[in-house]
From Swiss-Prot:
It comes from Salmonella typhimurium (strain LT2 / SGSC1412 / ATCC 700720). Signal peptide: none annotated. This is L-lactate dehydrogenase. Its EC number is 1.1.-.-. GO terms for molecular function: FMN binding; L-lactate dehydrogenase activity. Catalyzes the conversion of L-lactate to pyruvate. Is coupled to the respiratory chain.
Amino acid sequence: MIISAASDYRAAAQRTLPPFLFHYIDGGAYAEYTLRRNVEDLSQVALRQRVLKNMSDLSLETTLFNETLSMPVALAPVGLCGMYARRGEVQAAAAADAKGIPFTLSTVSVCPIEEVAPTIKRPMWFQLYVLRDRGFMRNALERAKAAGCSTLVFTVDMPTPGARYRDAHSGMSGPNAAMRRYWQAVMHPKWAWDVGLNGRPHDLGNISAYLGKPTGLEDYIGWLANNFDPSISWKDLEWIREFWDGPMVIKGILDPEDARDAVRFGADGIVVSNHGGRQLDGVLSSARALPAIADAVKGDIAILADSGIRNGLDVVRMIALGADTVLLGRAYLYALATAGKAGVANLLDLIEKEMKVAMTLTGAKSISEISGDSLVQELGKSLPAALAPMSKGDAA
């Protein structure tokens, strides 16, 4: 199969993975309206082509939280990453490390912090959820610090899990789920051999280490359902600073006022994100939400963005809309499922090449030169027409 884009990796991953795993990462909440709009809205952002600008000294390098990145991209936290390739977190981290960008380990990873961190030179980032079990949160923070993690990504848009209807149909949940997953694995021998047999243990490494016992997929589903804390507020986050003195990023911001609250709280960064369309269906796409948030807090806090980014052109679009750096989630997981570390490395190379083409043809020699001026402004609006808020007439 010819691989020339992330979309090729998606098709390959669908053939390789058992349906319960493919649809778990590919799907979204409810009718998946926001999932689709994440991609569609971003693809409609029109870039302003410029020519004869002498682009011979173009650079993608940028700095974030006193770290130098080879390009403004980091790998996002993805749960169960180790179910998509043998010890998947280790392989993805290695690809990111070789490229010179951060890897973010999920709370609900298969490989624990202590397994991943020693395999890479660059300090990795660690993602943590807001949970009822404060003892687990404290333990995870202490372990992340001991392992040399540099940045905490605190996910706040999951006070309760979203309703993902695909999971019940695919076998991730629903009637006879365990039996359905077993037969799906039998029908996908490449995955069954590489991950099902040779990728063990399939524990949730960070949770097992705290609970002192193995944890499987059923434990994962039950633990998540029982531990998210809907009572959390900004004030409750203050105690985290007692245990974490490094950069802290608040992930899951879609409203300018929440972005201002993050600044007041003293966060170092935010991630403009709707959790990849996996939480609340019908909310704004990240591309629609980003410009207003950038207007509110740009310069006061680092702005990261995810959801809908599929290629290097999308990275440039997000930066032009106001992001400093982007996070890749699904795109890298498709590549990981297809070809492990080599797949992720190739995807990152493709994104780098696509970014260079986009920057060359928009006249931006550096990341700092990508701005709203890189976008086509239509009818005097401050946003591209594709992202302008709908009028009442449009909504009808």
